[in-house]
Amino acid sequence: MSKHIGAQMLEFTQNGDERGYLVVLEGMQDVPFDIKRIFYIYGSDSTVVRGQHANRRTKFVLINVAGQCKVKVKDGKGNEAVFVLNRPHTGIYLPEMMWKDMYDFSEDSVLLCLASEHYDSAEYIRDYAQYEKEVNQ
């Protein structure tokens, strides 16, 4: 597991044989929070940028279960890192208050997103200047 500015790459156990592979994810075991929401992103063109926000309370684990994409994370203090998600048994953990941009999606990309909280639009910060202000207060 590598860690960058609060984001962490996670590697999940693969169980496999001649029939293929199985990856099991359980909240508070393989994922560092109870999973309250699951969604996935697919059909995004390679020029599309998704995300472009931070969450005040929600933590995420992002896993590209098919294809690949890149995730750029920023901490609002001048630090950033780029992760390539291209293996279905790896993911990235994003704590709350982490700015995220997902981009460079392959045609077959399916990005699975596990969230620690139910959806609440009020906890999203969609303006980067506002995000920096909140992080640095």
Label each PLM-derived region with a short phrase:
Residues 87-91, 97-104:
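Well-ordered alpha/beta subsegment
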Residues 1-90, 107-108, 113-114, 119-137:
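Non-catalytic, conserved peripheral segments adjacent to functional cores
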